[in-house]
């Protein structure tokens, strides 16, 4: 008997339902972490997303040198956020 089977039996749910709920919980936790990381970077520059940060750099309100690492981090985090949201729709 697998761990999934034992836990499912203990909580009177099917293994499939347990896995589905586990995946959802994991993805929601991951999404919360990503959104928190996005918030920290966005707040630092007073923007909502990577496009606003890019706009501030282009207008000279933020130097490219200062925002370089955060720009790519924010871009990657926003991509990760969308990926997680799509996975949540499928679960």
PLM segments and residue spans:
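Amphipathic alpha-helical coiled-coil segments and their boundaries
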Residues: 13, 20, 27, 56, ...
